[in-house]
Regions:
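Active-site micro-motifs of SAM-dependent methyltransferase domains
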Residues: 13-14, 51, 92, 182
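Serine-esterase "nucleophile elbow" of acetyl-processing enzymes
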Residues: 1-49, 55-60, 73-76, 84, ...
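Short secondary-structure boundary/hinge segments and terminal tails
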Residues: 53-55, 184-185
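Alpha-helical cap/lid subdomain in secreted, periplasmic
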Residues: 40, 64-213
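Acidic carboxylate-rich catalytic motifs and surrounding loops in phosphoryl-/glycosyl-chemistry enzymes
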Residues: 46-51, 177-181
Length: 213
């Protein structure tokens, strides 16, 4: 039976292109690349929203970016699921949202608990969970982005270690996005086409393992 994978994330999953201030071509977005590598053995659902946080309100946003509040509805929409990939935390680095890697880690833990405790319809089994640390924020000459993430370079560099420890504690899979991808200096937080493709390719082995493919 075809496996179903939900990619729950922010603009990195949506496919924001800092170079064009638009969206990467469908085939370049990491969930699309992951789909291509898995072929007909799995169906990969991209659920990305620009600005989404793990579990915090962004009162400057024009839509609900709180990942914890939206997640139960998304889970219900796409059930049954075999794997949920969580790639969030970069937007939590904004001081107006949370401002620390510790807060982002707490938020990821909240999402894991929501998935584990979800009232799945029709007695569906719950999915496996893969926590992915987003590639760390890098230096940029883009003044608005730099001003939005003061301290973000240092804090985001802590995410991989915190997420790895959390995954071990909660029995989730873990993948470090920094192992295959780097953020673009155009704005310091997003991925260019080459790096978003690299993320999709890099995730294939652990996703196959967790799906039993």
């Amino acid at each position: 039976m075809t496996k179903t994978v939900l990619c729950y994330g922010d603009s990195l999953t949506w496919g924001y292109d800092a170079d064009t201030i638009g969206r990467h071509a469908y085939e370049n977005r990491w969930p699309s690349v992951l789909q291509a590598t898995l072929g007909s053995e799995a169906r990969v659902i991209a659920e990305g929203l620009n600005g989404r946080t793990t579990a915090f309100d962004d009162h400057l946003a024009d839509c609900d970016r709180n990942g914890a509040r939206i997640l139960p509805t998304v889970l219900q929409t796409h059930a049954p699921l075999d794997l949920v990939i969580l790639l969030l935390g970069t937007n939590d680095m904004k001081p107006v949202v949370a401002g620390s890697a510790f807060a982002a880690c707490q938020g990821i833990g909240r999402l894991v608990r929501l998935i584990r405790n979800h009232a799945w319809p029709f007695e569906f089994d719950g999915p496996e969970i893969l926590i992915v640390a987003p590639p760390a924020i890098c230096a940029t000459g883009n003044a608005p982005f730099a001003a939005s993430f003061p301290g973000g370079i240092e804090e985001s560099a802590k995410l991989a270690t915190l997420y790895r420890d959390l995954a071990d504690e909660l029995g989730c899979g873990f993948f470090d996005g920094n192992s295959v991808a780097r953020t673009t200096p155009i704005d310091g937080i997003h991925l260019d086409a080459e790096n978003t493709r690299a993320l999709g390719r890099g995730l294939e082995p652990i996703v196959r393992m967790m799906l039993g493919l």
